[in-house]
Amino acid sequence: MKVQLQHRAIRVRLDRAEFDSLLRGLTLRLALRHSDDALFAVEICAGPRLELTGGAEGWRLQLPTGELEAYAPTLPRRDGLHFDIGDGLGIDLEVDLRGKSTTG
């Protein structure tokens, strides 16, 4: 998983195995640590609606399951999903099919 912060946007890039894990209800985690301190942490999961929350422990991004499920059978494709979180902030989700993949 790669998370890129841009002006008014968060870009999330997953490989196919990570995307499949989201569809199965698993939570993806990414943390950057220095010594014992968490400098950056994010959790991404699927749920009933789009939510972005943050706190001392990091961010949690919940992506709408229905939109993920509708997107899955259209892969591979060049464009990703875009979500408007409000206040001009966008979430872009892309699935990199050149990386690892799972079958089944």
Describe the residue ranges of each PLM region.
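Extended intrinsically disordered, low-complexity coil regions enriched in Ser, Thr, Gly, Ala
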Residues: 16-37, 69-81
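Beta-strand elements of well-folded, non-transmembrane domains
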Residues: 18, 46, 65-67, 95-99
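Short, structured motif recognition centered on aromatic/hydrophobic residues
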Residues: 3-5, 10-14, 59-63
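N-terminal intrinsically disordered, cationic/polar leader segments
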Residues: 24-26, 38-50, 55
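Residue-level detector of beta-strand structural context in well-folded domains
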Residues: 1-3, 50
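One face of beta-strands
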Residues: 10, 30, 48-50, 55-59, ...
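C-terminal charged interaction modules
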Residues: 77-104
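Mid-chain, well-packed structural core segment of small domains
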Residues: 48-80
